[in-house]
Swiss-Prot record:
UniProt keywords, alphabetically: NAD, Oxidoreductase, Tricarboxylic acid cycle
Gene3D superfamilies according to UniProt: Lactate dehydrogenase/glycoside hydrolase, family 4, C-terminal, NAD(P)-binding Rossmann-like Domain
A GO CC term attached to the entry: cytoplasm
Protein species of origin: Shewanella sp. (strain ANA-3)
One of the GO biological process terms: malate metabolic process
Catalytic activity entry: (S)-malate + NAD(+) = oxaloacetate + NADH + H(+)
Family membership: Belongs to the LDH/MDH superfamily. MDH type 1 family.
Residue numbers annotated as active site: H177 (proton acceptor)
High-level lineage: Bacteria, Pseudomonadati, Pseudomonadota, Gammaproteobacteria, Alteromonadales
Official protein name in the record: Malate dehydrogenase
Entry binding sites for substrate: R81, R87, N119, R153
One annotated GO molecular function: L-malate dehydrogenase (NAD+) activity
General function of this protein: Catalyzes the reversible oxidation of malate to oxaloacetate.
Binding site for NAD(+): G7, A8, A9, G10, G11, I12, G13, D34, N94, I117, T118, N119, M227
């Protein structure tokens, strides 16, 4: 099993690489790529951790050596949010970065499962899909927008609010990965009820949690560590699915034939082909149905931005 992290010298990439070095199955290979010259050194640093995961780092303009033979590719390359920016402000820089990296993926490891972490995810996943289509290698079951951070935040905030064991909290988060497009289905959380006020405030907190971190770091960064953990959870789920483990389900932003938009975050069953099955997200409350329907123009606009960028 080979996992490649592109953008591995950044805040998310280093956290993700550390977690993968400690969690990937014995005998796995982990390759780190970043344009930054420090990247081989990050790999040397991590190589001193005593786990049976072989690690190599590559720097420079060309990610090809890191991508050769990769089963899973996780892309966190790009610029991070600063105070006053929203995820869409990142588009101008990150769109080109994702396009260029996916062009290399299309040539070097077209069958790999690809998880896009680089924001704005609503748009960068659409960019990746268009690039892969142009190259004639697009498989909608192998491309994912990583929205796991919205899920782990929801789990955490619900557990805190209700005094639950966080390990027992399961919640689907649907839609997209920015602002109003993030929709936690709180009505489905088992064993707990929320007042209308709690639903409204909790939903808003989950939607704005990225900004909460950006502001708390006061210009010193964005949500890198929690995102690293979220990306590791999702990456490990992809690996476990590839290895044939049963019942691996995660929410992700995918081209899953949704009635709502071309790309939509919902639960998917993972396996040897990536997505084995797109799962229904279940019954929703009136509040959730309204929030879902009113986000769609925003989401579709984000997707169109990505499609138009490549065309």
């Amino acid at each position: 099993m080979k996992v490649a992290v592109l953008g591995a010298a950044g805040g998310i990439g280093q956290a993700l690489a550390l977690l993968l070095k400690t969690q990937l199955p014995a005998g796995s290979k982990l390759s780190l790529y970043d344009i930054a010259p420090v990247t081989p050194g990050v790999a040397v640093d991590l190589s001193h951790i005593p786990t049976a995961v072989e690690i190599k780092g590559f720097a420079g303009e060309d990610p090809t050596p890191a991508l050769e033979g990769a089963d899973v590719v996780l892309i966190s390359a790009g610029v991070a949010r600063k105070p006053g920016m929203d995820r869409s402000d990142l588009f101008n820089i990150n769109a080109g970065i994702v396009r260029n990296l996916i062009e290399k993926v299309a040539v070097t490891c077209p069958k790999a499962l690809v998880g896009i972490i680089t924001n704005p995810v609503n748009t960068t996943v659409a960019i990746a899909a268009e690039v892969l289509k142009k190259a004639g290698v697009y498989d909608k079951n192998r491309l994912f927008g990583v929205t796991t951070l919205d899920v782990i935040r929801s789990e955490t905030f619900i557990a805190e609010l209700k005094g639950l064991n966080v390990a027992d909290v399961k919640v689907n988060v649907i839609g997209g990965h920015s602002g109003v497009t993030i929709l936690p289905l709180l009505s489905q959380v088992e064993g707990v009820t929320f007042s209308d006020e709690e639903v409204a405030s909790l939903t808003k907190r989950i939607q704005n949690a990225g900004t909460e971190v950006v502001e708390a770091k006061a210009g010193g960064g964005s949500a890198t560590l929690s995102m690293g953990q979220a990306a590791c959870r999702f990456g490990m789920s992809l690996v476990r699915g590839l290895q044939g483990e049963a019942n691996i389900v995660e929410c992700a932003y995918v081209d899953g034939g949704s009635e709502h938009a071309e790309f939509f975050a919902q639960p998917v069953l993972l396996g040897k082909n990536g997505i084995e099955k797109v799962l229904p997200y279940g019954e929703v409350s009136a509040f959730e149905a309204n929030a879902r329907d009113s986000m769609l123009d925003t989401l579709k606009g984000d997707i169109k931005l990505g499609v138009d960028f490549v065309k």
